[in-house]
């Protein structure tokens, strides 16, 4: 017998992204492309300056590969420099599913609403000049997969 659980009043949008942490992005892109036909992947490097990670400011550099599939975006992430949630994830769990992402209109407003439920971000950064902001919400107590809320100026920012 199945049971249906009623959602709370957070009214968050559906998941639109699956984030996977990998050690070698080229190897992962090759695997997902040749094995499953996913892609094309757009590969980019990002320097994140002044990100908030567990209450402290950090600088780090990552490489990302992103591909769109019907209804979902696949994001592969490799940490290149610095102490990040990705390096900690690799140390604690190895490669694998890191986060499920949802797009919101306003990250700040969403965080304010979720804070009323005791939910706090563990990693966040904002680039107001390009209309990009994101925050990871820790869910180690249930399932261990982070939730990423992201705000982007354009609907498809790949």
Model-derived regions, located:
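N-terminal beta-strand motif that seeds the catalytic metal site of vicinal oxygen chelate
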Residues: 1-27, 95-104, 155-158
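Short, structured motif recognition centered on aromatic/hydrophobic residues
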Residues: 15-22, 32, 62, 72-77, ...
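Histidine- and/or cysteine-centered catalytic micro-motif in compact active-site loops
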Residues: 46, 79-81, 105
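Helix-adjacent hinge/juxtasegments
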Residues: 63-95
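Acidic/histidine-enriched, glycine/proline-rich intrinsically disordered or flexible terminal extensions
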Residues: 146-158
């Amino acid at each position: 017998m199945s049971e249906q659980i009623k959602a709370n009043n957070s009214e968050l949008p559906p998941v639109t992204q699956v984030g996977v942490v990998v050690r070698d992005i080229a190897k992962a892109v090759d695997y997902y492309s040749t094995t499953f036909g996913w892609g094309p992947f757009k590969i980019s490097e990002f320097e994140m300056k002044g990100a908030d990670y567990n209450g402290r400011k950090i600088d780090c550099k990552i490489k990302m590969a992103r591909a769109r599939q019907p209804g979902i975006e696949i994001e592969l992430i490799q940490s290149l420099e610095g102490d990040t949630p990705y390096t900690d994830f690799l140390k604690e769990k190895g490669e694998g599913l890191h986060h499920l992402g949802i797009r919101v209109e306003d990250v700040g407003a969403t965080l304010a609403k979720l804070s009323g439920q005791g939910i706090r971000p563990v990693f966040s950064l904002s680039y107001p000049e390009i209309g990009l902001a994101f925050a990871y919400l820790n869910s180690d107590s249930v399932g261990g997969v982070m939730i990423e809320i992201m705000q982007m100026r354009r609907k498809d920012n790949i």
